[in-house]
Amino acid sequence: MGIKKFFKIKPPKEDTVEQNRENLMDIGIATKSTTKKPQSKFAAYGQFAKDRATSKIYAPPGYEDFARPPEELEKKEGEEDDLNKSELDEKETKKDKKKKKKKHQQEDEPAAVQDPYARTEKSYRYNPDPYGAGAAGEKAFSSSGVYNEFNNYENGPSYGNEYGRRDRSEDLNAYNGTPGQPMKPVNRATPVLDRRDSAREDPAYGYNNQNRSNPYAGAGVGALAGGAAGGAVGAMGSVVSGSNPYGGASYGSGYGSSATTSAPVSKPISRTNTSASNPYGNASYGSTPGVNDRPAGSNPYAAISGDSYLNGTRSGNISRSGTNPYLRRNASNSVPPQAGYITPDSNNVALAEEENQQNQDELDLNDAPEDANEFVFEDKYMGRESKYAENSAALDELDLNATINDRGEDLNATGYGNMYEQQQQPQWQREEEEYGYGTQDDMNRGYKTFDEIQREEEERQKEEEDQAVDEIKEQIRFTKQSSVASTRNTLKMAQEAEMAGMNTLGMLGHQSEKLNNVERNLDLIKIQNTAADEKVAELKKLNRNILAVHVSNPFNSKRRRREREDMIKGRKMEDKMRAEHMSQELHQSTQRIEGALGGGNETSAVREKYQREKVLAAAKKYQFENDEEDDEMEVEIDRNLDKIQQISGRLKKLALATGEELDSQQRRIRDIEENTDEMDIKIHMNTTRLADIR
């Protein structure tokens, strides 16, 4: 049993970081301050370098994802980045989910509608699929089959397809229009449409079951009780079978005359169009209840007499019109009387007979347009055409041997001769008169003198010289514009190069600050490792055998104390000098970078003014008839060249500063490497010594 275990001696508790720092400061050992933050002048360039840094990976094709960090890989495998998504967005809570679930349940229940007039949630009137087959026993005029007890406006009739809502047990042959077999009526539970059902089922209202495939073909859609006129036309419309089942439908008013007989029509009523050409041509658009002054199938706008384009058609054969030749293109199509026709109203029959009497004149297609007087506008221009016809004789008597300028002369006209001679005068003669030579006598001579030829040659040479001068001017202007463009491009590239150099030097400044921080930390490690060496030696001395008594020499205690003080003083001075050296290196690096980044960019307004005057004075020897634009180009060329020269000087300074900074940082990095290796060895030795102590 050991002595420590016998006396139950426990090892002391380890000190915290703060306690250790305080203890080191009490014995005079330097520590790192946690409250003071180092001042950084080039932190922005550090962030700039961090943003532009790219991680380069090497991977075979198809295995790039395995080289990425796990966080990035999980993010990619998850949901894609949403630009509208924010970190402040909260997730949906359980309470919100319950509210949403309750809301959906209320929407699914028709009786849960709070507002009796609201149609926003579900529609009980209109079916999105009007031809979809409904359930058996469903209401005939309900698209959803649900009666809305809160909103009575929703319980009205629906205008869907009856074939989709029929009973499944009904006979399919009842809807196929089999001849000789009556149609099975549709059960309608809605009491509002009983009158319409009775009108459809009553044969007196024109409900014909033969050769029918649509129950709406013979019924009067606009009628509730069913008028006699609408029923008659509905009966006649049911005979004609066309491509549209609604061709025979009557849109007349249901309040027409009720006087009906069972006798057939003695005279067939002629109709304009059949259902094969126009499926809605047989529809009647009657308006006033109780008044039916037109037969069914007629045009409701035919009574407008003011419009010349509507006077041609009423019910049957279109008569010839003197104002509109396009109203005679329809052929007569009469319906033969058949048994079982409903006799229309007497007023309608009389009106139809009157219209047939007016349309007795058939159009002769062999008639000439002049005889028919079809186009009225031909009369308007007839007088003008006759006038041109009278003058056509003069064109036939045209003299083909006459010259172009040969025209009739009016000898009595004032100033005729001078004006005519002036018109006939050649261009070159008028130019000679303007220059002051070449009179009428000279022209009559037929030759030119030597002086005239010499003057013409001088004028020609002068024109050539002017053209050459203009060409030189244009060439000078073009060269100057090209020079301005070249200087602009050169200045732009020089500015880009300067910006790149400044960014590089700024990042080197940030790197210099980081190196200084590393050097300070290594210095603290070295100081504390020296104190650790002393503590390890003292611990080894105290942990020796209990029988080995260590007694110091009492005669040299003063000398040992003096040596220790000198050692502590020298160590402190060494640490201080090392810290000053590191600060000096950082200061030199900062001054070097700041001197290269700033300076030389200031421009004085006074200097710019005198520089402009100097440039314009020096450019006059090269300018010819200069204008304001020419002066501006000269000034811009000189300014750009001056800026390029300044940027070139700054680029040289940046290059030199960058080279010096790189050399300095390389030396510092080598020192850091050496100190790091040395400290690694010392720390390893202290660890080994502590392990040997038992």
Swiss-Prot record:
A single Gene Ontology biological process assigned to it is: protein transport
Q: Where is the composition biased (Polar residues)?
A: 269-290
Cite the entry's keywords alphabetically: Coiled coil, Protein transport, Repeat, Transport
- How is this protein annotated for GO cellular component? fungal biofilm matrix; plasma membrane; SNARE complex
Asked if the keyword Coiled coil belongs to this entry, the reply reads yes
Residue stretches making up the t-SNARE coiled-coil homology domain: 477-539, 631-693
Q: Where is this region: Disordered?
A: 53-138, 151-221, 246-299
What domain of life is recorded for the organism?
Eukaryota
- Does the record's keyword annotation contain Coiled coil? yes
List compositional bias (Basic and acidic residues) regions by residue number. Answer: 65-95, 193-203
What are this entry's molecular-function GO terms? SNAP receptor activity; syntaxin binding
Q: Which PANTHER family match?
A: SYNAPTOSOMAL ASSOCIATED PROTEIN, SYNAPTOSOMAL-ASSOCIATED PROTEIN 29
Q: Which family does it belong to?
A: Belongs to the SNAP-25 family.
- Tell me the protein's name: Protein transport protein SEC9
Q: Which gene encodes it?
A: SEC9
